[in-house]
From Swiss-Prot:
This is Peptidyl-tRNA hydrolase. Hydrolyzes ribosome-free peptidyl-tRNAs (with 1 or more amino acids incorporated), which drop off the ribosome during protein synthesis, or as a result of ribosome stalling. The record marks N12 as: Discriminates between blocked and unblocked aminoacyl-tRNA. It comes from Stenotrophomonas maltophilia (strain K279a). Monomer. PROSITE patterns: PEPT_TRNA_HYDROL_1. Its EC number is 3.1.1.29. GO terms for molecular function: peptidyl-tRNA hydrolase activity; tRNA binding.
Length: 192
């Protein structure tokens, strides 16, 4: 399988959303850019901010859609068209209610699982054949509390766990960029 050429962090723009659970995808690509010493640039034709990084000797584009979460597909598909990147060479990093804070999982293909950024991207692509990095944020316990939960800020303890999961995911990105997803998954999914 081809390696990654585009890594998208899903989230909501604006300072009021900056440290919310729903912006775990933004936090992931921001940490990748920081580690690489890359700078973010506004790119209106791609409806977001972009950064160019080197991972495992390969050029990889990072993208933070400036659309709100439920319109993320517009930015994702614009970037894929502009840079001529296939969906299979794309990873979308997003918050995951079904995983505990401190857990991150890689996945290829599938549905949206109620995640609106994935839903919009799948709608525009016509399929879900792209990679996902699911960053655990935990579940509030009842579906009626989900909106407030994802749009809220995590506790200090959960914030540390989420940051640790992001660091663990960054550690396996060289393997994913080289196309060795099975080894990347094995390392990320094996408890330490």
């Amino acid at each position: 399988m081809a390696g990654l050429r585009l890594i998208v962090g899903l989230g909501n723009p604006g300072s009021e959303h900056a440290r919310t659970r729903h912006n775990a995808g933004f936090h992931f690509v921001e940490a990748l850019a920081e580690k690489a010493g890359a700078r973010w640039n506004v790119d209106s034709k791609l409806f977001g901010e972009t950064a160019k990084v080197e991972i495992a000797g390969q050029t990889v584009w990072l993208l933070k859609p400036a659309t709100f979460m439920n319109l993320s597909g517009k930015s994702v598909t614009a970037a894929q068209r502009f840079w001529k990147i296939e969906p299979e060479e794309t990873l979308l990093a997003h918050d995951e209610l079904d995983l505990a804070p401190g857990v991150a999982r890689l996945k290829f293909d599938g549905g949206h699982g109620g995640q609106n950024g994935l839903r919009d991207t799948i709608r525009l692509l016509g399929h879900g054949k792209f990679h996902r990095l699911r960053v655990g944020i935990g579940h509030p316990g009842h579906k009626d509390r989900v909106v407030g939960w994802v749009l809220g800020r995590p506790s200090k303890e959960d914030d540390v766990l989420i940051a640790r999961a992001i660091d663990d995911a960054i550690d396996v990105m060289p393997l994913a960029v080289q196309g060795d997803f099975s080894e990347a998954m094995k390392r990320l999914h094996t408890p330490k």
